[in-house]
A protein has these predicted regions:
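Ligand-binding pockets and gating/stacking loops
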Residues: 1-309
């Protein structure tokens, strides 16, 4: 949402896109909101169990562009009357949504970006096969959304978020390690395909990738042959963005208990992404509803020097 506010969007392509599927555990399936910045900068959700259906819903479906514009003119005249009696500011947000929807229908670039059938079959095959079945309270294994994310960025989206499968394995079934052997190779296939794709298309310096979760796993194995939640130490994988890659930054003790060398904060990762997007963290601010400016990260937080120094 910060990036959408500061950089704006291209006509017909939302700046902030979510390919995150709603999940039984609600927090795993949300890409956030616009907060005080406004709903017009919230992520636009573009997921559907049928990947082809989402593209079709963004085309005119037999209606001429002239007829669409006539309908838009009528709607706008009615909304102007509503806006005169609106004291909440909600109409302004709706106007932004309506304009964005109109641009999407008229432009067609978003629908084209979502249509992976336009890709060469060998490229699609590289990413693996989607499994639309929901993984208990987690997301489905829509591995080709890595490809959709690349197409969206090429079309002009600035930020794309996605979720994949389910990783909360420390319950009573004792299948933590069997699931690891199943899930990690599939994730590796989609992620490595995306990185390879970006290099082949000359985008490796223009697109930044971050893969992470909100916490790590316990050094000790519990009585159910699984590892529990562990907030003391975590990891993130980054690629692209013209960064200095091929290195491990920081270290934990020998048990993986907590950092003992170069701990990295979450906000440092965000600062690095903002830096890669050309945002000056020393001066970029966004005002809240009262006009008070907010910096994007806390004072003293800088991009990860090992990556961008």
């Amino acid at each position: 949402s910060w990036v959408s506010k500061l950089h704006g969007s291209k006509p017909g392509i939302p700046a902030n896109v979510s390919l995150m599927y709603p999940t039984g555990n609600r927090t795993w399936g949300e890409a956030g909101t616009g907060g005080f910045i406004g709903n017009s900068h919230a992520p636009m959700g573009l997921v559907d169990k049928d990947p082809n259906a989402r593209a079709k819903s963004m085309t005119l479906q037999g209606m001429s562009l002239d007829r669409l514009m006539d309908r838009e003119a009528l709607r706008a005249s009615m909304d102007r009357l509503k806006a005169r009696i609106d004291t909440t500011g909600q109409m302004e947000g709706l106007d932004t949504y309506n304009q964005q929807a109109l641009e999407i229908l008229a432009d067609g670039n978003l629908a084209a970006a979502l249509d992976v059938s336009q890709e060469h079959p060998s490229v699609v095959e590289r990413y693996g096969i989607n499994d639309p079945k929901y993984q208990r309270d987690g997301a489905p294994k829509m591995i080709r959304n890595f490809l959709v994310a690349r197409r969206l960025v090429e079309a002009g989206a600035r930020v794309v978020s996605l979720n994949y499968s389910r990783w909360d394995w420390h319950g009573g079934d004792g299948l933590n390690f069997p699931r690891s052997r199943e899930e990690f190779p599939l994730l590796d296939q989609g992620l490595s395909a995306l990185i390879t794709d970006l290099h082949e298309r000359g985008l490796q310096n223009d697109v930044s990738i971050v893969m992470w979760g909100e916490f790590g796993r316990t050094p000790k194995i519990n009585k159910m042959n699984s590892r529990d939640h562990w907030p003391k130490a975590n990891f993130a994988f980054v690629a692209g963005g013209g960064m200095n890659l091929g290195q491990v930054i920081g270290a934990t003790d020998k048990h993986g208990n907590e950092p003992i060398e170069r701990p990295v904060r979450f906000q440092e990762v965000f600062a690095t992404l903002y830096h890669n997007l050309g945002i000056d963290l020393s001066s970029a601010t966004v005002e809240d509803a009262s006009g008070r400016p907010h910096f994007l990260v806390d004072p003293g937080i800088k991009p990860i020097r090992e990556l961008v120094g």
